[in-house]
Structure formats: structure tokens, C-alpha cells
Amino acid sequence: MIYPGRGASLSVAVALVLFSSGAPWTFREEKEDVDREVCSESKIATTKYPCVKSTGEVTTCYRKKCCEGFKFVLGQCIPEDYDVCAGAPCEQQCTDHFGRVVCTCYDGYRYDRERHRNREKPYCLDIDECANNNETVCSQMCVNTPGSYRCDCHSGFYLEDDGKTCTKGERAPLFEKSDNVMKEGTCSATCEDFHQMKMTVLQLKQKMSLLSSNTEINKQMTNEKMMMTTNSFLPGPPGPPGPAGTPGAKGSSGSPGQMGPPGLPGPRGDMGPIGPSPDLSHIKQGRRGPVGPPGAPGRDGMKGERGFPGPSGPPGPPGSFDFLLLMMADIRNDIAELQSKVFSRPLHSSFEDFPSAPDSWRDTPENLDFGSGEDYKSQSPPKSSRKRKLPRNLKNPDWPV
């Protein structure tokens, strides 16, 4: 698919928009843009709209496009119903593809993209069918022609009707010349020429008989004449296209297309050679200045791992037994209240029911100097105090065990 240039190129470029200041800008399009279009004689509509530059200044910008009912083809604004192939812009075949010119080559020709890119003609080159025997299938000789080929036979052979097969011998003549001897200066015709003219007249009559208005001519056609007009004398399929004509004059170059998108970044190049070392002898170095104030403290770091346990400390002083006695007294009061609620009668209870703590259990100035452990065990009370019996009033049967 190719798109050659055609005629004088009309620059419908957007460069006029940026000629004012050359600074980068942005635009703000409004709804009234359609009403501001002005169509010129070249069918190019110019639209004005406000735009804002990068500096914040509001200015007027212009945008160009084809007027309504026109389309942009090969740098020109032409009517939408205009045939772009009317001026024969292509070398061989032209197709209107939605307003674009599509040039193709005939059968038997190939399109050379490089020649067309360099604007060299002809860019539709002939295909040598004889170079590949599988395409021609000629039994003996193949002769390449512009856009096609033909088969020939050696001496003593003749070409069959298929145009490819050669048969040994000579072809028998289909028609012989008339035996009538014509005088010099007169026209003579062979039987073959006469037969062809007769068949042509019969074919014309057959076509006319198909028309509804020519009923009388249809009646005059006999069965014998209808039998003679067989399919063998009907016109055959169209032949291959003829050779290409001489190329025309070179047209003017078209308008430059729009700038394409930027390509992908290329690979990073190799590092260049290291330059010479700088000369620092001319740089003066003074005395180092004072140390500045410390900066702001940084953020707290992550919590560290737990350290190893430290050594065991010395034993502490012995504990007091008074707290345990108070707790037992509270439990006794709770039990007494529970019994009074269950049995509905008061029970005898006194603080004397509990044995008093031995003097050796109380905190004395002598015991405060001792710590826990073996040192405290050495100060155990005498056996007489440890075997002290409980009073008999604790053997009350009403006391729950």
C-alpha cells in the first residue's frame, strides 16, 4: 500500500500557532469555537480560541482544519465527494481508500518499496515468470513479456491450444484460402475472415433479440443460426493488462507529514576515557572553621535484642507473718457470716480461737538483720514453743473442718 505525493503541496501546518512567542503554552477551548471558524478560498477553516501560556498570560491561538464538506488529502482540502484517483496519481492502479490514495500494481508486477521511497520510476517492476518453472509450466521454452509470459516450441513442434504443451509435428490449417484468383489491385478475403464476420453478425442479432422491443428480429432467427452461435465463438475472458506506459514527469514533493512519536531510548553508551587530573595548586585552602552546633536528634531506632541475665543479688530480709494472720481472720469472719445465714442462729466465735503467733515469728530488731535462706533457718524457735497445743475451745463441733 503506497501513498505518493500529488500536485503542489498545501501546507496546513500548526506551526503558525507557535510563531508568536515560541514559549510553551496550553489552551482552553470554549463552546463558541464553532462559531468563530472562518472558511477561506482554499477551503481551510481557521478557528480562534483563548489559550493560556506557561507564564499565566491569556492570549489568542489559531487552529486550522478543512472546512465542512471537505477532507484533507495529499496536503489539500478537496470536496468529500471528489474522486482522488481522477488525476491518475498512481503509476498503474489507484484506489480511493476513505479519501486516501492507495496505489497498487497489475498482476505480473511487483511493488518496489525502496524505489518508491526514493521517488524512482518505475516502482512497479515486471516479474520474471520464466525464472520459476513451477509458475509457467511450459513444456519447452518460456519467453518473458511485460507483466506476463508466453510459451514457445522448438523446431518440429507446435503449441497446443492450452498455450503450454508442445506436440511434435505441424498443426493442420483450420481454413484454406479461396480458390478464386483475384486480380492485382483488388481486395481478397479468406474463408476464415468470412466465417468470423458471419459469426459476428449472428452474435449481434442474438444480443438484439434479448431486448423486449425487438420482437420481430427474434422471430427471424432460425434454429440453424442459433446452433451456429455456440459458446466457442463467444468473446473470451479479458486478456492480461498491457505493458505500462512511459512514466510521466516527476511531480512536486508533498508537504511534510506530522512529527511521529519519539522512539524508545537507546542503550547506554560506553564510558569515555578518563580526563586529566585537575590542577588544584591555584586553589587556596584556608584554616578549618569551628565545629557547628549539633543537629537535631534523630528518630528512635529499633528495639534491640534482650540482654543476658545479670548475676543474682544478695538475699533480702525475712518476710512478715502478720499479713497471713490478717487474711486468715478475714476468712474466718466470712465463714462465720455464711454459717449464720445457713443455720439461722449465731455461732460462738472469738478471736481467741486462733492461736497467737509466736514471738519468734514477729519482726524484732534482732531478726531484721537476718535475710532469707539458711541464715533465717538458724534462728528457729525452741521446741517448747513449736509444740504448743491449741486451746480446747477450737474443738467445737459446730466449727466446720
Swiss-Prot record:
SMART domains from the entry?
EGF, EGF_CA
The residues covered by the EGF-like domain are 126-167
Stated consequence of mutating residue 162 to E:
In fof(hu3613); lacks the thoracic duct and the previously unidentified intersegmental (ISLVs) and dorsal longitudinal lymphatic vessels (DLLVs) but retains a seemingly normal blood vasculature
Keywords of this entry:
Angiogenesis, Calcium, Collagen, Developmental protein, Disulfide bond, EGF-like domain, Glycoprotein, Repeat, Secreted, Signal
Q: Which InterPro entries match?
A: Collagen, EGF-like_Ca-bd_dom, EGF-like_dom, EGF-type_Asp/Asn_hydroxyl_site, EGF_Ca-bd_CS
Q: Which pairs of Cys residues are joined through disulfide bonds in the record?
A: 130-142, 138-151, 153-166
- The answer to whether the entry has keyword Membrane is no
Which residue ranges have biased composition labelled Low complexity? Answer: 246-258
Q: From which domain of life does this come?
A: Eukaryota
Q: What results from gene inactivation?
A: Significant reduction in phosphorylated mapk/erk in the nuclei within the posterior cardinal vein endothelium at 32 hpf. Loss of facial lymphatic vessels including; lateral facial lymphatic vessel, medial facial lymphatic vessel, facial lymphatic branchial arches and otolithic lymphatic vessel at 5 dpf. In a svep1 and ccbe1 double knockout model there is complete loss of the facial lymphatic architecture at 5 dpf.
| Cellular-component GO terms for this entry | collagen trimer; extracellular region
GO BP, one example?
A: lymph vessel development
Known tissue expression: Not expressed in blood or lymphatic endothelial cells, correlating spatially and temporally with the migration routes of endothelial cells that bud from the PCV, migrate in association with somite boundaries and seed the horizontal myoseptum region from where lymphatic precursors later migrate.
Among the GO molecular function terms of this UniProt record, one is:
calcium ion binding
List where Pro residues composition bias occurs: 235-244
User: Which residues does the annotated region (Disordered) include?
Assistant: 229-321, 344-401
Its family remark reads: Belongs to the CCBE1 family.
What is this protein called in UniProt? Collagen and calcium-binding EGF domain-containing protein 1
Q: Which organism is it from?
A: Danio rerio
